[in-house]
Amino acid sequence: GRERVKKVLDAVDAEIADFERKISSGQSRERVLTEMKEAHEGFYASVRNIMRDAANDVALRSAIEGVVAELISVPEQFEVAIEMALGSALQNIVTKTEEDAKYVIEQLRRRNYGRATFLPLSLVRPRTLNENERAVTRTPGCFGVADELISYDNKYRNAVSNLLGRTIIVRDVDIGIAINKRVGGTLRIAT
């Protein structure tokens, strides 16, 4: 219920506070995100290491499309909501095929880098709203479906839709709860 939502929000607030300390040094939020992407700073060590190696390894680089955080562009007003909605999936490694994912997994294992989560474009299926659910997104205070509020190359549509196609971004928790009640609690909500 609401307590659980509060716990999630508190955890996210703690992460944001850390992020904002970096921002308070006069950097724009966008620059921090860009630096995070470029250095893969704030990423799991396994992801950071394999992406660093991919920069100098043609076979590895050709197997990896990128990490989710690099493949999406988020308007500033929705950054916190999208970060919250995606959580660790921001670090999922997108590959063209299952074979590419297997190759990268093998490289992670060989290099003792640990684990990572993969989204092979050949396998991943989009998640969408039904008509009834889509109708509630027109409620005042609902900004829309998360995957429709961000930009990305069309070839990543299924992956982005899989992660965000059933998440709606709302102005506040109360609106989210009210909307979700109307569709039987089937949607993910982010503020």
Model-derived features with residue positions:
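Extended, EK/Q-rich alpha-helical coiled-coil segments that serve as long dimerization/scaffolding arms
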Residues: G1-E41
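Hinge-like oligomerization/junction regions that interrupt long coiled-coil arms in large cytoskeletal
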Residues: S25-T191
